[in-house]
Each structure stands twice: as structure tokens, then as C-alpha cells.
UniProtKB/Swiss-Prot annotation:
Single annotated GO MF: phosphoribosylaminoimidazolecarboxamide formyltransferase activity
Domain MGS-like: from-to ranges: 1-149
Protein name: Bifunctional purine biosynthesis protein PurH
InterPro entries listed in its UniProt record: AICAR_Tfase_dup_dom_sf, Cytidine_deaminase-like, MGS-like_dom, MGS-like_dom_sf, PurH-like
Species of the source: Xylella fastidiosa (strain Temecula1 / ATCC 700964)
Matching PROSITE patterns: MGS
Family statement: Belongs to the PurH family.
Entry EC no(s): 2.1.2.3, 3.5.4.10
Domain of life: Bacteria
Annotated Pfam families: AICARFT_IMPCHas (PF01808), MGS (PF02142)
NCBIfam families cross-referenced by the UniProt entry: PRK00881.1, purH
Gene Ontology cellular component annotations, sorted alphabetically: cytosol
Endpoints of the signal sequence: none
Listed pathway(s): Purine metabolism; IMP biosynthesis via de novo pathway; 5-formamido-1-(5-phospho-D-ribosyl)imidazole-4-carboxamide from 5-amino-1-(5-phospho-D-ribosyl)imidazole-4-carboxamide (10-formyl THF route): step 1/1; Purine metabolism; IMP biosynthesis via de novo pathway; IMP from 5-formamido-1-(5-phospho-D-ribosyl)imidazole-4-carboxamide: step 1/1
């Protein structure tokens, strides 16, 4: 089959997206391909002055039920499913002519149901029946039929026709068939997800549950990975069929080696953390934990402060910025340390030119526009956990001062900064911060007080003074020992969720040490 080229004599076009339709029809006619079509598609082709036969004339059966029935006919499906050399006699007996090319895209179900005023009746009316049936018939018979589902496929399809004088290769037909089955599967998944989410069908606008009774997600493989988290594991990177703009899956790699599994995990943590800041910021991540974060007036000073938090851990890290990366900062990074991945929304031309001096460094560009991910997914044994994303940020007006001392303006600014960082540190998470930069980070300890001690050790190792700093904790302190440990290192203000049975003891400890403390009422566990 590898060298099996088949000529296209007859094509059926029935599309909801009319993009490129007339141009496509003209090229097909130039190769003497007979055109069949339905409804509005046929009208547009005919209005362009091009010859086309209505499917209703072919089947000798009119479109009916407001277009619900128009292609569900043996003449159509026989023309798509008939096997060359096997079904020829049967097709001739029943007057069925082969259809060699099918161009169909489906009713826009996802776009219609995304509208706030979409009723259940609107959704049901947008469920395509004839289109998927034809796509499946044509794709099943890829040995003789080619099928396209999107205007994005037209250029390659026409290029193949032109290169082979009106013929299509077996490889092209098979690739198009796979794409068609994937398209139908995605379409059916969207219908299932929508209908499975309807909790009350009797209201004017159907009440929908956030989590459907059956969840069908579709992902597209972007690349195979050298290996998974460890060399003995295999791995691949998939992205959502409709990725959220501004998220990691939309990256463009500008230079460097192939990304690894761990690169992608760390890059996602770094990018999600840095894009929450409004001012120029830098986040350095190692093993999915921030090891240095800072906000500055420019990328250069943000990087310098972030790096100073933990230079040892920054070695081989992933560095992300939320502003255009300039040449000065690029040179500072590459001359100072080994870095696996750099991420920014844009790069100066001089910065990219300097990056070529370290050709193995992976340089990613991700436009920062777009909302954060709406949901998080985590696999467990034979199961999937789904939750709304931890996207809730707090502002100064929502902080509850619970101690005798209230934080100063500068402390309040640093508390909110540290709180934003703590959200991206593995629990139990403790962050020491001062002047919009991290001083020490304690991550992933089973005991919160040990995370606090580690944050202090990190600060001491980096020769950063903790005295006068603030502390953020991703969850409440169950005992006063965490506050006692913080006071011993010189912490002067604390931000935490509150909610412990011993909050009064913890507050009393803060008052004893002259520490200002605020409650957020929000927890930021991260596992």
C-alpha cells in the first residue's frame, strides 16, 4: 500500500465552516473532479459560478426534517464504503458510484454550547448526525477514499493532489483517516461531557454540574520524550486539543536540546508562579519547587535577587520571567550559572543572539496573555482526581489582623508577595521574604516547624539576614512552635490561613514575640 496512489474523480463537500470552500472547489474542478454537495455548501459553490450536483439529486430523495436527514442514504454511504475490486458488482447493480474524496466539518457543538444563552434544545439541534456517519464511512475505507475535516487540512491536501496530478497517496489517505476518527471521537466526547453535566433539563437554561458524570478529555501528542521522570521510564508530552492561551503547552522552543519530562514539570511550575505577578518578576525552580523568587523594576534586578536566595539550588534550574528578556539579563544568567530552561513571553534580538553561545540551553517563548488553567488533574491508581485550579489570590483588604501589632505597609507588601510564592511551594511550605524577594524557602517537609527551620538554614547559607523579614505558611500552624522558631530567627510578621484549634495559642505566641500576624482564611496545600 506504501506506493498506492489513487486518482480522485468524485468529491462530496458538506461543511459548516465555509473558510476556503470556493478556492478548494476551484482546484478540485481544475483536476476534473466532479463535485457533490448539500444545502448551504452547494449554494455557496453554485453562487461562485462553479458546477456542483446536489446530493438530493444523486439520491433521488429530498433533504427533510429541517436538514436532519440528507446524507443518510445507501447511495452516499455505499459510495464511501464500497471496496475496489470487491464491491464493484454490487455497486453497479444498485447504481452506486464511488465517492473518492469527502470534505466534511461538523456542526460547531462546542462553540454553541459555550454560549451563556444556549438552551438544551439549542445544544441538541447542534448535534451532527450525518456528518460523523460519513466521516466514519470514508475513514474506514481509507484504502480507496480520502477524507478531510478542517480547512486547516486543505493546503496539504491540495499540495498532494497537485504533486501527484490529481492522485492521493496511501500514506496521505491513512493520515487523513486517523485525523477523521480523532475528530469524531473529540466531537462525541464534547457531546458526552455536555449532556453528562446537565443536572436539570427542565429549566429554560439547563442547570449544569461543574463535574460531569462521565469525563472525556482529548489530548494530542506533541512529542516523544527521551524518557520519563527517570531513565528507565518511557514518556511523551501531550497537550489539550484546545490549549488555554498563555499556558505552558502553547510554548514555542527557540533553541536548545529537546525538553525532558522533568524540564516540562519544572517549567510549568516556574511559569505558573511567575505569571501571577504584575511587576517584573523572576522565578527559579528546581524539582518543581521555587528556590528563588523576586519582583523588581526590571528583569535584571529581579533575577539577581531571586538567584541570591539559593545559588546552590539555582544551578541547573529553570528560570522564568514575566517580561521581555533583555540581553543584559541573558548574559548575566549564562555567564553565571548552568541553566536548563529559560522562559519568557518575549526576547530581545540581542538576548537571543547571546543565547546561541550556549546552544544547549532550552529557550521557550510563551505569550503571557490568557487566563490560568481552570482545572487540575492528578492520576491515582485506576482513577483521576479533578479539582478547580488554585487560582484564588488575596488582596490587602481581605487580610485579617489577629495580633496586637498590625503589619506596616512594607510588611504587608512583603506578606502578600510571600503568600503568592507559598502557593507554588510543595507542602508543608514556609517562605521567608523581605523587600519583594525570597530570603529562604522551606519545602515539602512532613512537619511545618521543620520547613520553617529549613527556610532559616537556607537564608543563613546564602548570607541573607532574616531579621525584619516576614513569613508565609501555606496552611495553619497547629502549635505555637512554628511561631517560636520564626521569632528566634528574627521574623517580624506572619501570614497564614488560620483555622487551627489552637489559633489562640499561636496568636498569643506572636504577641509575646512582638510579631504582627494576619489570617487569609485560604489554604494553599500543594502536593
Amino acid at each position: 500500500m506504501a506506493s498506492d496512489f489513487l486518482p480522485v474523480h468524485r468529491a462530496l463537500l458538506s461543511v459548516s465552516d465555509k473558510t476556503g470552500l470556493v478556492e478548494l472547489a476551484r482546484v478540485l474542478l481544475a483536476y476534473n473532479i466532479e463535485l457533490l454537495s448539500t444545502g448551504g455548501t452547494a449554494t455557496i459553490i453554485r453562487e461562485a459560478g462553479l458546477p456542483v450536483q446536489d446530493v438530493a439529486d444523486l439520491t433521488d430523495f429530498p433533504e427533510m426534517m429541517d436538514g436532519r436527514v440528507k446524507t443518510l442514504h445507501p447511495v452516499v454511504h455505499g459510495g464511501l464504503l464500497g471496496r475496489a475490486g470487491i464491491d464493484d458488482a454490487v455497486m453497479a447493480k444498485h447504481g452506486i458510484a464511488p465517492i473518492d474524496l469527502l470534505i466534511v466539518n461538523l456542526y460547531p457543538f462546542e462553540q454553541i454550547t459555550a454560549k451563556k444563552d444556549c438552551t438544551l434544545a439549542d445544544a441538541v439541534d447542534t448535534i451532527d448526525i450525518g456528518g460523523p456517519a460519513m466521516l466514519r464511512s470514508a475513514a474506514k475505507n481509507f484504502a480507496r477514499v480520502a477524507v478531510a475535516t478542517s480547512p486547516d487540512q486543505y493546503p496539504d491536501l491540495l499540495a498532494e493532489l497537485q504533486a501527484h496530478h490529481g492522485q492521493l497517496s496511501a500514506e496521505k489517505r491513512f493520515a487523513l483517516a486517523v485525523a477523521a476518527f480523532n475528530h469524531v471521537a473529540q466531537y462525541d466526547a464534547a457531546i458526552s461531557n455536555y449532556l453528562s453535566s446537565v443536572s436539570d433539563m427542565h429549566t429554560t437554561l439547563p442547570l449544569r454540574h461543574e463535574f460531569p458524570t462521565q469525563l472525556n478529555n482529548t489530548f494530542v501528542k506533541m512529542t516523544d520524550l527521551r524518557y520519563g521522570e527517570n531513565p528507565h521510564q518511557s514518556g511523551a508530552f501531550y497537550r489539550d486539543v484546545h490549549p488555554q492561551p498563555g499556558t505552558l503547552a502553547t510554548f514555542k522552543q527557540l533553541q536548545g536540546k529537546r525538553l525532558s519530562y522533568n524540564n516540562l514539570v519544572d517549567a510549568d511550575a516556574a511559569w505558573e508562579c511567575v505569571r501571577q505577578f504584575e511587576a517584573p518578576a523572576c522565578v527559579i525552580v528546581k524539582h518543581a519547587n521555587p528556590c528563588g523568587v523576586a519582583v523588581g523594576t526590571a528583569c535584571s534586578d529581579a533575577y539577581e535577587a531571586a538567584y541570591a536566595t539559593d545559588p546552590t539550588s539555582a544551578f541547573g534550574g529553570i528560570i522564568a520571567f514575566n517580561r521581555t528578556l533583555d540581553a543584559v539579563t541573558m548574559q548575566s544568567i549564562l555567564d553565571r550559572q548552568f541553566v536548563e530552561v529559560l522562559i519568557a513571553p518575549y526576547y530581545d534580538a540581542d538576548a537571543l543572539a547571546y543565547a546561541t553561545k550556549k546552544a544547549n540551553v532550552r529557550v521557550l517563548r510563551i505569550p503571557s496573555t490568557g487566563a490560568m488553567n481552570r482545572y487540575d488533574f492528578k492520576r491515582i491508581g485506576s482513577g483521576l482526581l479533578v479539582q478547580s485550579a488554585d487560582s484564588l489570590n488575596i488582596h490587602s483588604g481581605a487580610l485579617k489582623v489577629v495580633t496586637q501589632l498590625a503589619p506596616t505597609y512594607a510588611q504587608q507588601r512583603d506578606l502578600l508577595f510571600a503568600w503568592h510564592v507559598a502557593k507554588y511551594v510543595k507542602s508543608n511550605a514556609i517562605v521567608y521574604a523581605k523587600d519583594n524577594r525570597t530570603i529562604g524557602i522551606g519545602a515539602g517537609q512532613m512537619s511545618r516547624v521543620y520547613s520553617a527551620r529549613i527556610a532559616g538554614i537556607k537564608a543563613a547559607d546564602a548570607h541573607l539576614a532574616v531579621t525584619g523579614s516576614v513569613m508565609a505558611s501555606d496552611a495553619f500552624f497547629p502549635f505555637r512552635d512554628g511561631i517560636d522558631a520564626a521569632a528566634a530567627t528574627g521574623i517580624k510578621a506572619v501570614i497564614q490561613p488560620g483555622g487551627s484549634m489552637r489559633d489562640n495559642e499561636v496568636i498569643a505566641a506572636a504577641d509575646e514575640h512582638g510579631i504582627a500576624m494576619v489570617f487569609t482564611g485560604i489554604r494553599h496545600f500543594r502536593h
